Amino acid sequence: GMKKKNQGLKQKILFTTLTVLALMAAIVIGLAYKTITDSMHEQTRDYMEKQCKLFLSILDNHYPGEYGIGQDTSGAYFLVMGEEVISDEYDNLDRICKVLDVELSVFGRDMRLMTTICDENGERVIGTIASPVVIRDVLDGATPTFYTDAEISGIERFVYYEPIFTQNGEVIGIDRKSVV
């Protein structure tokens, strides 16, 4: 009887030790995963920031003048740079985004005025309003912001927002890149 009892105790101790080891392994894997994820997120953020700056510099080179928001007779808003309406200039935008494999939107204040994102009917998703979080962080906070869990059209994406400033330092809009 005594021998059997000891064996049961040994098995219990062994099982407990294995459980602790398994738990430690899970925690270590969790931490490693977080570290890998963090560095991946950082790389993704850097990559997206460069793409935003590239796109904005292409616009700057192509259209002299300052960003502005106009309104047509129907009340619809549009994006201007200098004298040019740019929110319907999609040739370059679509080509760049296809090559880089990203989606891009430009917001005037909080409204999406230019985008490569299309709905299920193939129509560009124009006129939608940025989320309250984005308005707070990017427009009001005037800060470039990277989100790792933004949902757009039901797909989770990495999203990077870059505020667009007027010459007097006011935030006029947001340049937004998203990567699936």
Language-model region placement:
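Short, Lys/Arg-enriched N-terminal segments with co-localized hydrophobic residues
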Residues: G1-M2
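Juxtamembrane membrane-water interface segments immediately C-terminal to a transmembrane helix
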Residues: V20-L21, Y33-S57
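Short N-terminal helix-loop-first-beta-strand/juxtamembrane motif that initiates sensory/input modules
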Residues: D46-G68, D91-M114, P144
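Beta-strand residues that line the small-molecule/cofactor-binding core
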Residues: N6, E156
